[in-house]
């Protein structure tokens, strides 16, 4: 059927088993050829040693390994948006030791002032920093202790004071103890 010498043997179609002697497949390698031709003639002890050598390396996946084992020195980048700013920024919460350092960093990040005053007196400032917690609720920055804030914060937003009242966000009286 196929003409010899033209290299068309590989494209030859057959119905059923070949009548001739099976040829060694020269185009593709079998798994045993890739594996180095490991023979199964040895005892069960030999097979166990081969299995140990051929185990999958890197399991569990690297991503879950990093999440579980590299918590120390990790970075907690949070998205920060500001009303009126056409861009978002990210800030690492782990670099800051408290709300005052965070407020100063936000002021430098967006070139605005008054965020630090908003933490102390939210009634007399133009902008108010708020955050979304794990439950999806928006809260004022400074309402909870710093450690709890770091654990629950998903993203930050700097709103105008008039818009924050629409969210029904009122500062708690005990706000100054966390600052």
Curated annotation (Swiss-Prot):
Chain location of the short sequence motif EAR-like (transcriptional repression) per the record: 13-17
GO biological process: auxin-activated signaling pathway; regulation of DNA-templated transcription
Similarity field: Belongs to the Aux/IAA family.
UniProt xrefs under InterPro entries: AUX/IAA_dom (IPR033389), AUX_IAA (IPR003311), PB1-like (IPR053793)
Subunit structure: Homodimers and heterodimers.
Subcellular localization(s) per the UniProt record: Nucleus
Source organism (scientific name): Pisum sativum (Garden pea)
Keywords: Auxin signaling pathway, Nucleus, Repressor, Transcription, Transcription regulation
Record gene name: IAA6
Keyword check for Transferase: no
Record-given protein name: Auxin-induced protein IAA6
Inducing stimuli: By auxin.
Segments of this protein annotated with the region Disordered: 31-52
Main function: Aux/IAA proteins are short-lived transcriptional factors that function as repressors of early auxin response genes at low auxin concentrations. Repression is thought to result from the interaction with auxin response factors (ARFs), proteins that bind to the auxin-responsive promoter element (AuxRE). Formation of heterodimers with ARF proteins may alter their ability to modulate early auxin response genes expression.
Domain PB1: 75-163
Domain-level remarks: The N-terminal half of the protein contains two conserved domains I and II. Domain I includes a slightly degenerated ERF-associated amphiphilic repression (EAR) motif which seems to be involved in the activity of transcriptional repression. Domain II is required for the correct degradation of the protein through the SCF-mediated ubiquitin-proteasome pathway. Interactions between Aux/IAA proteins and auxin response factors (ARFs) occur through their C-terminal dimerization domains III and IV.
Gene Ontology CC terms, in alphabetical order: nucleus
Location, primary (coarse class): nucleus
Keyword Repressor in annotation: yes
Entry-linked Pfam families: AUX_IAA
């Amino acid at each position: 059927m196929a003409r010899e010498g033209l290299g068309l043997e590989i494209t030859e179609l057959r119905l059923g088993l070949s009548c001739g002697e099976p040829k060694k497949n020269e185009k593709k390698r079998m798994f045993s050829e890739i594996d180095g031709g490991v023979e199964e003639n040895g005892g069960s002890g030999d097979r166990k040693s081969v299995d140990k050598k051929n185990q999958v390396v890197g399991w569990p996946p690297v991503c879950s390994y990093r999440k579980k084992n590299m918590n120390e020195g990790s970075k907690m980048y949070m998205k920060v948006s500001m009303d009126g700013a056409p861009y978002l920024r990210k800030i690492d919460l782990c670099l800051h030791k408290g709300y005052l350092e965070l407020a100063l960093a936000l002021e430098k990040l967006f070139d605005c002032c008054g965020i630090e005053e908003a933490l102390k007196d939210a009634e007399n400032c133009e902008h108010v920093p708020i955050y979304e917690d794990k439950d999806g609720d928006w809260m004022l920055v400074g309402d909870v202790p710093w450690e709890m804030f770091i654990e629950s914060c998903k993203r930050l937003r700097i709103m105008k004071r008039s818009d924050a009242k629409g969210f029904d966000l009122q500062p708690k009286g005990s706000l100054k103890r966390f600052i």
